């Protein structure tokens, strides 16, 4: 009986620890403020020959993008191989006033730094990300 209780406690503890990382990422995205941003650079590829591009957001675009980013809800972390797909890819490098940078790549799976997550409210927000993906 003691072994069962110990196993239950270990499983609960591991579940809590695994869930904390996801909550931290959501909290980080929700708490970014436009006033903390020096610049947002949008880079990517259209998937075609000579399809690379780079663009820096205007002040108004930074505000709009951060407002959108604050609404993102991420789910479980997924394997990089599952998340990667061919075709067009957009990256947003957020340059913070603290001289730190955060690179994200929204898609069906949402990349934050070097990790990929389920994009839980993809259907709700994707059309708004398409607007930013179209700015070049």
Describe each PLM feature range:
Residues 1-18:
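Sec-dependent bacterial lipoprotein signal peptides
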Residues 20-136:
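Function-determining sites in protein domains
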């Amino acid at each position: 009986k003691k072994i069962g209780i110990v196993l239950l406690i270990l499983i609960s503890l591991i579940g809590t620890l695994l869930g904390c990382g996801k909550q931290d990422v959501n909290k980080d995205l929700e708490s970014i403020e436009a006033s903390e941003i020096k610049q947002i650079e949008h880079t990517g590829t259209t998937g075609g020959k000579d399809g690379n591009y780079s663009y820096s957001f205007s002040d108004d675009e930074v505000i709009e993008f951060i407002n959108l980013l604050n609404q993102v809800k991420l789910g479980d972390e997924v394997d990089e191989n599952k998340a990667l797909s061919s075709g067009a890819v957009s990256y947003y490098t957020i340059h913070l006033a603290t001289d730190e940078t955060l690179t994200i790549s929204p898609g069906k799976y949402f990349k934050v730094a070097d990790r990929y997550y389920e994009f839980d409210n993809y259907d709700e927000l994707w059309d708004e990300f398409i607007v930013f993906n179209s700015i070049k």
